[in-house]
């Protein structure tokens, strides 16, 4: 199955082949700020699953608060939508903003990262694997 992720203005698009390797929500400050929401929702694919990229992309590179690797975040140069990212600590994987896909193309998240930082009002689907829970 081929899936297409698009930015808000439609100038950027990314085609992906196959199923994601990971479907996760993250509650860290970085993901909350990236999305402007209570958490970030991401899907990860092997680099070879990325078929095509189109549109004007801008790069923002930084070291995450964890200090692990360097993240390269790509967003639409026209509208600012975060499209995808890579991290030197996870070679061969491309993370993508799940909200850029049509909602029916992805199932619910299967992992909740840094769950101890989750907003108290956020509930998760049954069966989600939790890491980083509060002590």
Model-identified regions with their sequence ranges:
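A short Gly-Trp-Pro
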Residues: 1-135
């Amino acid at each position: 199955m081929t899936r297409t992720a698009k930015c808000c203005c439609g100038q950027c698009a990314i085609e992906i082949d196959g199923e994601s390797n990971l479907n996760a929500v993250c509650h860290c400050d970085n993901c909350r700020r990236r999305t402007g929401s209570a958490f970030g929702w991401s899907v990860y694919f092997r680099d070879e699953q990325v078929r095509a990229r189109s549109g004007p992309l801008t790069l923002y590179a930084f070291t995450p608060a964890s200090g692990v690797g360097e993240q390269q975040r790509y967003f639409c140069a026209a509208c600012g939508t975060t499209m995808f990212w890579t991290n030197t600590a996870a070679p061969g994987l491309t993370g993508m903003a799940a909200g850029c896909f049509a909602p029916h193309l992805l199932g619910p998240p299967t992992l909740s990262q840094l769950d101890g930082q989750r907003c108290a009002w956020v509930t998760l689907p049954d069966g989600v694997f939790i890491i980083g829970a509060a002590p």
